[in-house]
UniProtKB/Swiss-Prot annotation:
This is Protein PA-X. The gene is PA. Transmembrane segments: none annotated. The lineage of its organism: Viruses, Riboviria, Orthornavirae, Negarnaviricota, Polyploviricotina. It is found in: Host cytoplasm; Host nucleus. InterPro entries: PA/PA-X (IPR001009), PA/PA-X_sf (IPR038372). Belongs to the influenza viruses PA-X family. GO terms for molecular function: RNA binding. Coiled coil: none annotated. It comes from Influenza A virus (strain A/Chicken/Hong Kong/220/1997 H5N1 genotype Gs/Gd). The probable endonuclease active site in the N-terminus and the basic amino acid cluster in the C-terminus are important for the shutoff activity. The C-terminus acts as a nuclear localization signal. The C-terminus is recruited to host protein complexes involved in nuclear Pol II RNA processing. Pfam families: Flu_PA. The keyword Lipid metabolism does not apply. The record marks 195, 198-199 as: Important for efficient shutoff activity and nuclear localization. Plays a major role in the shutoff of the host protein expression by cleaving mRNAs probably via an endonuclease activity. This host shutoff allows the virus to escape from the host antiviral response. Hijacks host RNA splicing machinery to selectively target host RNAs containing introns for destruction. This may explain the preferential degradation of RNAs that have undergone co- or post-transcriptional processing.
């Protein structure tokens, strides 16, 4: 799993995930499933933010060209991925500036258009159960919750999905990609089931090679939120080709 993570995700995302785990005394080389989950969550948070800006009229717009415009500001403030001290500093600054209530737990994003903190979830389990767990933990109607699953489902507070359909589809396609690449290497079952993960760890199973013809390398171009991978889900033709390649994967 560790090899898969380092190959599938941009190095800067991997580095952030490693720092996050070490801050809590966890070892990415041992808790590899958590390592993969944190990288996935980080990437979804960055994708959620990418290309979304607020214009001079306060309207939300999407800009993908990278053409600089001084009148535009990022719609989302990314809190996830920062060390705890810096993250709380950012949260306190937002609360002092906007007047919103300070959340009890660190959220993932702040939405300047809707003036609310946002909690992003990525689950391998039943989405409704995971959503309720998040809601019960946060216990605040003022923090917006948006959950994505690896099966293409999503659930959000009051069915308010915040982003346009295309932006959400990019996230779902990326999660689909991650799931299929894990499955092609025999890693998906252990990622979903902790019991299976322990069994594989005891047997010291090695990861299988990637599916023939399946892209496993990422480009390292700069995105608006982070120097993250160039999204291969951006182009519908490439997405269709990618899905077709999954169907042709040979089971070993």
């Amino acid at each position: 799993m560790e090899d898969f993570v380092r190959q599938c995700f941009n190095p800067m995302i991997v580095e952030l995930a490693e720092k996050t785990m070490k801050e809590y005394g966890e070892d990415p080389k041992i808790e590899t499933n958590k390592f993969a989950a944190i990288c996935t969550h980080l990437e979804v948070c960055f994708m959620y933010s990418d290309f979304h800006f607020i214009d001079e009229r306060g309207e939300s717009i999407i800009v993908e060209s990278g053409d600089p415009n001084a009148l535009l500001k990022h719609r989302f403030e990314i809190i996830e991925g920062r060390d705890r001290a810096m993250a709380w500093t950012v949260v306190n600054s937002i609360c002092n500036t906007t007047g919103v209530d300070k959340p009890k737990f660190l959220p993932d994003l702040y939405d300047y258009k809707e003036n609310r903190f946002t909690e992003i979830g990525v689950t391998r389990r039943e989405i409704h159960i995971y959503y309720l767990e998040k809601a019960n933990k946060i216990k605040s109607e003022k923090t917006h919750i948006h959950i994505f699953s690896f099966t293409g489902e999503e659930m959000a507070t009051k069915a308010d999905y915040t982003l346009d359909e295309e932006s959400r589809a990019r996230i779902k396609t990326r999660l689909f990609t991650i799931r299929q690449e894990m499955a092609s290497r025999g890693l998906w079952d252990s990622f979903v089931s902790p019991r299976e993960a322990k069994r594989q760890l005891k047997k010291d199973l090695k990861s299988q090679g990637p599916c023939v013809g399946l892209p496993t390398k990422v480009s390292h171009l700069t995105s608006p939120a982070l120097k993250t991978l160039e999204p291969m889900w951006m182009d519908s033709n490439r997405t269709a080709a990618l899905r077709a390649s999954f169907l042709k994967c040979r089971k070993k």
